[in-house]
């Protein structure tokens, strides 16, 4: 078996949510190619890690403003049927996040994010499931794995949840007629 791996940082210029200031956000990407025989087509996987904010599971949703956020990282691994761009995967993840992560925030942006984090609930389980559903309905993606790593900044904990497409797991993928 021959394995070749290549990792690199990928930057996207984004606008902050309120002040519309430009900032660069870094995402870690990698390609992994594996082949077991010379006549076999290599298996190529692409992965990207996207930082987001999700709701801390111990938050008190019944108290006004009682929700807390946690830093989460979504790691996507995909095997593609055809070209797909890292920006598309980042957009997919951030669309389902409670709040995306920015490298720069003004005080107006911080206030907006804090208010959203304390008033809206979006668990890492919900985010992972929504991303899985999007990937399962994306015809360019042959196989996927979604992992959500969660880090408690005040409570000093870390957790991980994940799912992947499997022919043995019902509803982890959809037939091409359904896409």
Regions from the language model: what does each represent?
Residues 1-179:
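N-terminal intrinsically disordered, cationic/polar leader segments
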């Amino acid at each position: 078996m021959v394995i070749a791996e290549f990792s690199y940082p990928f930057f996207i210029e984004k606008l902050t949510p309120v002040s519309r200031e430009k900032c660069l956000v870094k995402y870690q990407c990698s390609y992994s190619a594996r082949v077991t025989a010379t006549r076999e087509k290599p298996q190529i996987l692409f992965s990207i890690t996207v930082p987001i904010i999700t709701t801390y599971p111990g938050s008190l949703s019944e108290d006004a403003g009682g929700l807390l956020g946690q830093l989460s990282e979504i790691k996507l691994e995909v095997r593609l049927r055809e070209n797909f761009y890292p920006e598309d995967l980042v957009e997919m993840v951030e669309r389902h996040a409670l709040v995306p992560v920015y490298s720069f925030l003004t005080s107006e942006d911080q206030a907006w994010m804090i208010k959203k984090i304390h008033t809206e609930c979006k668990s890492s389980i919900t985010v992972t499931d929504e991303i899985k559903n999007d990937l399962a309905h994306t015809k360019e993606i042959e196989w996927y794995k979604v992992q959500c790593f969660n880090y408690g900044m005040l409570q000093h904990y870390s957790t991980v949840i994940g799912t992947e497409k499997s022919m043995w797991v019902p509803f982890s993928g959809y037939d091409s007629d359904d896409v």
